[in-house]
Each structure stands twice: as structure tokens, then as C-alpha cells.
From Swiss-Prot:
UniProt cross-references to SUPFAM superfamilies, sorted A to Z: FMT C-terminal domain-like, Formyltransferase
Protein encoded by which gene: fmt
Lineage: Bacteria, Pseudomonadati, Campylobacterota, Epsilonproteobacteria, Campylobacterales
Any one of the GO CC terms: cytosol
InterPro entries linked to this entry: Fmt (IPR005794), Formyl_trans_C (IPR005793), Formyl_transf_N (IPR002376), Formyl_transf_N_sf (IPR036477), Formyl_transferase-like_C_sf (IPR011034), GART_AS (IPR001555), Met-tRNA-FMT_C (IPR044135), Met-tRNA-FMT_N (IPR041711)
Organism: Campylobacter jejuni subsp. jejuni serotype O:23/36 (strain 81-176)
Name listed for the protein in its UniProt record: Methionyl-tRNA formyltransferase
Amino acid sequence: MKKIIFMGTPSYATCILKALVENENFKLVALFTQPDKAVGRKQILTPSDTKAFLSQNYPSIPIFTPSSLKDENIIREIKDLNPDFIVVAAYGKILPKAILDLVPCVNLHASLLPKYRGASPIQSAILNKDEKSGVCTMLMEEGLDTGAILESLECDIKDKNSSEVFELLANLAAKLILTTLLNFDKITPKKQEESLATLCRKIKKEDGLINLQNARELYQKYLAFTPWPGVFLENGLKFLELELVDELKQNARMGEILELEKESFLLACKQGVLRIKKLQESGKKALDGRTYLNGKRLKSEDSLC
């Protein structure tokens, strides 16, 4: 039975953690995750998704929430746990060389490396209209997602939003980590092709700001930034649910309401048409498209804003 230290934080990581802790071939000896964070208007101290899962279901397994992994006491603690592997998935902290050198550190990255190294591989794949994505297991080194690839699995992501792709890739990663660790001694690590490498940065709230220039580009942003940060106009109006109707139509005014439907409406972009199904003004409740227009006394051929 191989001893595992798992390092991960969000729900994506929880899916992988669950697969490991439930598998009889592995023994989870510790979880490392981000410290509890103050959440919401009341700033309630809230544990990470992985910590909440493990403490509720496996309370005897130790959980560590260090502010830094460079602390000598933390490194000593990891040595004392004597793991066979350290598995990392969306942890949110960089592992120092002192830890990387202890045992094989296997990272699960949500892209087909070397494409989309960095913090937002799923959103970047959607923004770039990729129809395929996947997940890789890789041997960690000091560079950002530059380690040798062990195994990978591919899937279709066309017309899926980030939330859906996260769930899809989390399930793939949960399967992949088991095969990678069980077959570790038989796998020949493959160096990444540096000439094909691309980087992606962390998503910020302001990335959700949209205009009505291009319906296809707006739709891709909507898919990429659902559920966070969402997409919103400069006046704060959020589009919560929408569909791409036409990519090419250009014979209407940008922002013109083209047609009212039972619970939605068609909206003209400079290029293309969208169906707006649900939207929300800042500080107000979400409404279906038709109800919103009725409340604003807007009709066909009027401008949305």
C-alpha cells in the first residue's frame, strides 16, 4: 500500500482526493490545503473544499494549512510522514525544491500540456474556442508546469462552460491519478515540447467586462467565465444566461432589441445575435429576459442600454 500526501484546495481537487482515499491500494497520510478564508459579507471563516470533505468523512487523517511550504518545520513534518508520493492538484502554492527532491511529486494539470501552463487552463481553452481539452499527470519540477508528462486523457469541451468543464476534467483526473500511480514504475516520462508551450494567467474580476461588438467572442467569454467572474456590461448589467443565435448578422444597430420571446429576447451585436435568457442589474434580483424588458418598458427595436 503506497502512502500519499495530497495537496489541493478547490472542488476539482476534492474529486481527486476522494478517489485516492477510497482506493485500497493507497493510504492517505495527510492533506495539505490553503488556510481557511473569510467569505461573504459577514466574512465567515470557511475551510477549503478539500478540508471540509476530509474533516467530515475522514477526521483521523491530519490536515495541514501552512502559509508557506518553505518553513523547515513543515518540511520536517513531510519527511516524518514518509510518503511514497506527493500528489498535487490546484493547491495554490509553489512547492520548494526541498520538497520536490523528497519523493516523486505528481501534479494533475487541467490541460493537454504544454498548452496552457499556468493558472487558468480551462478558461483559456474555452476563450480560444478549443473543441478538445484534457488532463495530464506530470512530474513536478521548479518550473511552472514544465515537468515531464506521465499520462493524459482527452475530452470534448465544445459549447461547455467552465463549471461543466471543471467537473468533466475533475472526473477524468480522478481516474488518471489512479492509473498513473499504480503503473508509475512502468511509465516512461515524456519531456514537454517547449516550442508548443503557452502560458495563461490568473483570471481577474475585470476580465468579465464585455461589450456588444462580437456575439461569438461574447459567447465564449460567457462560457469561460461562468460561474466566475461572470460577464457584465460597463453599467454593471450582468448576462446570467445567454445563447449564440447568429455569428454573422450585421444589419442591425449594436445593442438593438430584435425580437421579444416568451422568457427571453434577441439582442443585436455589431456582428452577430444573442438570445438573452436571464440578466441582473447590480444590487437587484435576477430576472428572465422578457420580464426585465417589461420592467424597463423596452420593446422591439429599442436599445438595451
